């Protein structure tokens, strides 16, 4: 089970948008955590948030939304969650994660769960010199306390910091959060206090370590930019390790859900928005942007092509300076340079269907809604406003005139 803490205001972001809704890889921080959590098939994913954010999250499917009525700190948020989570039993393992730590990997969470045996809870730490993070106090191989850095007079240049994620059995978590006392200076309840509470109750507390990049907590726009950089670097490595060629990896940008098949080649300066799936052996040329689009095996898209809300068939070529929107293109078709699908009439968008083995000549405009059937040919420079029957040639440009210059 997951408890995601998302009630913080994020004042340092200087934004009207709640902090956890700021995006990395075209998905919000909260979406990253939920996306990863779902890969682990938990019985319950609960998000604790304030009322205004709850209203914005009601579109989320299969997520339990829990309102923290007053912003009384992370300890109060978890206490509210365990009191309200559905079908919670003592033996359930609960992962508590802050909503501003979107880069935590499932392999790390799995390692923490494995470390939980014989312990009340397990925390995650990382080495850093950044004094904004709380510090893990380790004695004889066990975690004894988490302290805020400003309260720690003996802090070293580099220390083991708190990454803001805990794993515990529901029974232990429920009992420990009930013992958290209100901080006298801030009037908040700190979740980190449960470590010292557990130790005083003669319970073992474990810890696992990771690197600072994975544990990045996002509190400012600068942190957001760093997290975007780390995310993109990780995705580039993932795809190259998966058999995808990135000609200039640092110039290619991915979304959280981008899928690319083996032996595809991605050329420089390509941007993948949400919802892109690319089959094996495809080629995506320079300066191409794709969003909500499926590209078939062996297809070639770009350079300077934008494809949006479209399905592009196997071995189809859309090679130069084209816009393909709300369009389905069949197999082995060729879309010539400068082709534009005119899908928006000023009020709503319309679909275009281009069949298999079609040829669309350069500088053509296709006015949706439109159907171009299999094996049709559209002559260069045509403006197509009516459906094209199967195996037909269509020419709409005027006859060329040649006149003598006086």
UniProtKB/Swiss-Prot annotation:
Residues 1-221 are annotated as: Pyrophosphorylase. Its cofactor is Mg(2+). It is found in: Cytoplasm. It comes from the Bacteria. GO terms for cellular component: cytoplasm; membrane. The active site is at 320 (proton acceptor). Residues 243-406 are annotated as: N-acetyltransferase. Transmembrane segments: none annotated. InterPro entries: Bifunctional_GlmU, GlmU-like, Hexapep, MobA-like_NTP_Trfase, Nucleotide-diphossugar_trans, Trimer_LpxA-like_sf. GO terms for molecular function: glucosamine-1-phosphate N-acetyltransferase activity; magnesium ion binding; UDP-N-acetylglucosamine diphosphorylase activity. Acetyl-CoA binds at residues 337, 343-344, 380, 397. Mg(2+) binds at residues 100, 219. UDP-N-acetyl-alpha-D-glucosamine binds at residues 5-8, 19, 68, 73-74, 98-100, 134, 148, 162, 219, 308, 323, 334. One of its GO terms (biological process) is peptidoglycan biosynthetic process. It catalyses: alpha-D-glucosamine 1-phosphate + acetyl-CoA = N-acetyl-alpha-D-glucosamine 1-phosphate + CoA + H(+); N-acetyl-alpha-D-glucosamine 1-phosphate + UTP + H(+) = UDP-N-acetyl-alpha-D-glucosamine + diphosphate. Residues 222-242 are annotated as: Linker. Pathway: Nucleotide-sugar biosynthesis; UDP-N-acetyl-alpha-D-glucosamine biosynthesis; N-acetyl-alpha-D-glucosamine 1-phosphate from alpha-D-glucosamine 6-phosphate (route II): step 2/2; Nucleotide-sugar biosynthesis; UDP-N-acetyl-alpha-D-glucosamine biosynthesis; UDP-N-acetyl-alpha-D-glucosamine from N-acetyl-alpha-D-glucosamine 1-phosphate: step 1/1; Bacterial outer membrane biogenesis; LPS lipid A biosynthesis. Binds 1 Mg(2+) ion per subunit. Catalyzes the last two sequential reactions in the de novo biosynthetic pathway for UDP-N-acetylglucosamine (UDP-GlcNAc). The C-terminal domain catalyzes the transfer of acetyl group from acetyl coenzyme A to glucosamine-1-phosphate (GlcN-1-P) to produce N-acetylglucosamine-1-phosphate (GlcNAc-1-P), which is converted into UDP-GlcNAc by the transfer of uridine 5-monophosphate (from uridine 5-triphosphate), a reaction catalyzed by the N-terminal domain. Homotrimer. In the N-terminal section; belongs to the N-acetylglucosamine-1-phosphate uridyltransferase family. In the C-terminal section; belongs to the transferase hexapeptide repeat family. PANTHER family: BIFUNCTIONAL PROTEIN GLMU (PTHR43584:SF3), NUCLEOTIDYL TRANSFERASE (PTHR43584). This is Bifunctional protein GlmU. It comes from Wolbachia sp. subsp. Brugia malayi (strain TRS).
């Amino acid at each position: 089970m997951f408890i995601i803490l998302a009630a913080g205001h994020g004042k340092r972001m200087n934004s009207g948008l709640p902090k956890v809704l700021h995006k990395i890889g075209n998905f919000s921080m909260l979406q990253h955590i939920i996306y990863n959590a779902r890969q682990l098939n938990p019985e319950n994913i609960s998000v604790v948030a304030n009322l205004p954010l709850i209203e914005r999250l009601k579109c989320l499917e299969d997520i339990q939304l829990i309102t923290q009525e007053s912003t009384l700190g992370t300890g109060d948020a978890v206490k509210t969650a365990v009191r309200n989570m559905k079908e919670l039993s003592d033996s359930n393992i609960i992962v508590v994660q802050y909503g501003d730590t979107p880069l935590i990997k499932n392999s790390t969470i799995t390692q923490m769960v494995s470390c939980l045996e014989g312990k009340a809870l397990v925390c995650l730490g990382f080495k850093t010199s950044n004094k904004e993070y709380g510090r893990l106090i380790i004695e004889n191989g066990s975690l004894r306390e988490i302290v805020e850095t400003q309260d720690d007079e003996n802090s070293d240049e580099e220390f083991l910091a708190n990454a803001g994620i805990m794993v515990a059995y529901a029974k232990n978590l429920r009992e420990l959060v009930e013992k958290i006392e209100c901080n006298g200076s801030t009037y908040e309840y700190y979740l980190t206090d449960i470590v010292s509470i557990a130790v005083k109750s003669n319970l073992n507390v474990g810890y696992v370590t990771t690197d600072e990049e994975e544990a990045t907590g996002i509190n400012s726009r600068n942190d957001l930019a760093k997290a975007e950089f780390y995310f993109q670097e990780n995705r580039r490595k993932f795809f190259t390790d998966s058999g995808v060629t990135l000609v200039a990896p640092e110039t290619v940008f991915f979304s959280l859900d981008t899928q690319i098949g083996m032996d595809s080649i991605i050329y420089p300066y390509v941007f993948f928005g949400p919802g892109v799936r690319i089959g094996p052996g495809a080629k995506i040329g320079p300066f191409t942007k794709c969003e909500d689009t499926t590209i078939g095996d062996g297809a070639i898209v770009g350079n300077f092509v934008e494809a949006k809300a479209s399905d592009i068939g196997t071995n189809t070529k859309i090679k130069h300076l084209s816009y393909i929107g709300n369009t389905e293109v069949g197999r082995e078709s060729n879309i010539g340079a400068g082709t534009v699908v005119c899908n928006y009439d000023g009020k709503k968008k319309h679909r275009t269907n281009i069949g298999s083995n079609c040829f669309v000549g350069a500088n053509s405009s296709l006015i949706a809604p439109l159907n171009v059937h299999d094996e049709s040919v559209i002559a260069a420079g045509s403006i197509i406003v009516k459906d094209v029957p199967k195996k037909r040639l269509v020419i709409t440009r005027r006859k060329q005139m040649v006149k003598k210059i006086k």
